[in-house]
């Protein structure tokens, strides 16, 4: 082979690596407001200086403040009763996400504008089922699903959503809005609609006497409470190499990659099975107890929430991958006591592959919530009871994640690796190509051993009208196998 052949090979490797990086950015959510210029505009806009969020000082740190609300106390009577003013030619539209036509409009807007790469090679493929699952949690308010339309054509050109959640930040629990899917049509970025959308959803949330919110972004805004890093686990090497997601390493072969990322044919933990409705009370108690270990976490105050997030998206029919399935939730039932000892779950968010002669969809799974009782004191008796499941919450919460002794930490690491290994088998059998996870929860306990590779994206967590000390997102603790302090999974 002559020098020109070597150069061609090197150029091809560089091209494939850059293409893979583009897809990594999609999966990492780095371009989550459309193009890079639109994201930059939101981050630099003077709008944030007017909002009750911790401000970044000249040194790059936020100004010290006491933990708690930033704004002075208010009531809904203090809130403007009319919607904010839009630029000429646009109008507000409350979106009924249960209406098939309106949910399709949101789907099209998000797919074409929410996340994209520069070459238009990959796009998130939001399904109606995913949007229903994400936006209709118990207690949701249709008024918090806000669109902007062109007055003349009624075309939907912008969207933002909120759902009610109860959130705990260290010792304080309060109602909040989870804000998501802020999207402006890429041709209208110069209209500065994003700040107007944020103000409007804030106004509507405040009218319900809720004054705090949680949200995430791949860009730096004032001011992150914590940051997580994305990791990716290859499940389908031939396809990922073919579409440019995973360049073939020099000296390696597809066959070697297949062997490297192979998984067993069936789960290995005794009692590992799909979650059922009758599991909800036990799962809820176990999950709440587990999440008490983190500095920020969703409270999951009642079983309706648990049933929605882990069962409502299970799809139709039985066996294998179901029609319209969005979430996969599995538990471990003790064969002797019939206690639920573990929960683990993931959700699906595929990406459309544009302009590829063979493949049109990248099936991506994302780690969702999990919990295990191996870190808790054993129950007082072998008989199943809710009291046993709830026992010891305060003592574990006092220790906190990362505060367990070495023996308990090792038990947690071993159990999470076993649970994740079984979940990867389920994902592989369901036809997923890649499995994604952040460094939140205790994910660092298993990422390395389960062959997750680091992405180049980071997800920043934010609280609106709430100041708190920084919370560890685990992005620096992957090799140390140290859990994070973030216990909220944002879609």
Swiss-Prot record:
Name where it's found. Answer: Cytoplasm
Superkingdom of source: Eukaryota
GO MF terms held by the record: glycylpeptide N-tetradecanoyltransferase activity
SUPFAM superfamilies the record matches: Acyl-CoA N-acyltransferases (Nat) (SSF55729)
Which InterPro entries would you find in this protein's record?
A: Acyl_CoA_acyltransferase, NMT, NMT_C, NMT_CS, NMT_N
What is this protein for, i.e. what is its function? Adds a myristoyl group to the N-terminal glycine residue of certain cellular proteins.
State the family named in the UniProt similarity comment for this chain. Belongs to the NMT family.
Identification of the protein by name: Glycylpeptide N-tetradecanoyltransferase
What species is this protein from? Cryptococcus neoformans
- Taxonomy-wise, where does this protein's organism fall, top ranks first? Eukaryota, Fungi, Dikarya, Basidiomycota, Agaricomycotina
């Amino acid at each position: 082979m002559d020098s020109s052949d070597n150069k061609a090979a090197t150029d091809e490797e560089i091209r494939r690596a850059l293409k893979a990086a583009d897809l990594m950015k999609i999966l990492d959510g780095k371009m989550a407001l459309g193009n890079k210029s639109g994201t930059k505009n939101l981050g630099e806009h003077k709008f944030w200086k007017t909002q009750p969020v911790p401000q970044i000082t000249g040194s790059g740190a936020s100004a010290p403040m006491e933990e708690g609300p930033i704004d002075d106390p208010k009531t809904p009577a203090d809130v403007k009763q009319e919607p904010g003013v839009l630029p000429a030619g646009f109008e507000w539209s409350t979106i009924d996400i249960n209406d098939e036509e309106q949910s399709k409009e949101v789907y099209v807007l998000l797919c074409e504008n929410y996340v994209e790469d520069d070459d238009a090679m990959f796009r998130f493929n939001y399904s109606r089922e995913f949007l229903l699952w994400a936006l209709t949690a118990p207690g949701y308010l249709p008024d918090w699903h806000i669109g902007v339309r062109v007055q003349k054509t009624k075309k939907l050109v912008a969207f933002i959503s909120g759902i009610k959640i109860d959130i705990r930040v260290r010792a304080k629990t309060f109602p909040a809005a989870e804000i998501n899917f802020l999207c402006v049509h890429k041709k209208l970025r110069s209209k500065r609609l994003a700040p107007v959308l944020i103000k409007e959803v804030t106004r509507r949330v405040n009218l319900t006497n809720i004054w705090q919110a949680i949200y995430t972004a791949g860009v730096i805004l004032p001011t992150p409470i914590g940051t997580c890093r994305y990791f990716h686990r290859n499940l389908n090497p031939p396809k990922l190499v073919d579409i440019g997601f995973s360049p073939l390493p020099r000296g390696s072969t597809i066959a070697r990659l297949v062997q490297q990322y192979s998984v067993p044919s069936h789960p290995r933990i005794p009692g590992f099975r799909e979650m059922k409705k009758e599991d909800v009370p036990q799962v809820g108690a176990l999950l709440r107890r587990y999440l008490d270990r983190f500095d920020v976490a969703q409270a999951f105050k009642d079983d309706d929430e648990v049933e929605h997030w882990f069962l409502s998206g299970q799809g139709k029919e039985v066996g294998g991958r179901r029609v319209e399935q969005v979430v996969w939730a599995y538990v471990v039932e003790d064969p002797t006591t019939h206690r639920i000892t573990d929960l683990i779950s993931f959700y699906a968010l595929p990406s459309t592959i544009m302009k590829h002669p063979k493949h049109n969809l990248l099936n991506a799974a994302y780690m969702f919530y999990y919990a295990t009782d191996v870190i808790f004191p054993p129950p007082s008796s072998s008989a199943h009871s809710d009291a046993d499941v709830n026992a010891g919450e305060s003592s574990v919460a006092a220790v906190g994640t990362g505060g367990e002794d070495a023996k308990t930490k090792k038990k947690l690491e071993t159990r999470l690796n076993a649970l994740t290994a079984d979940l990867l088998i389920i994902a592989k059998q369901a036809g997923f190509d890649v499995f994604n996870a952040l460094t939140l929860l205790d994910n660092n306990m298993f990422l390395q051993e389960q062959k997750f590779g680091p992405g180049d994206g980071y997800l920043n967590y934010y609280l609106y009208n709430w100041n708190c000390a920084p919370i560890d997102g685990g992005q620096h603790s992957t090799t140390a196998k140290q859990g994070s302090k973030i216990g909220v999974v944002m879609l």
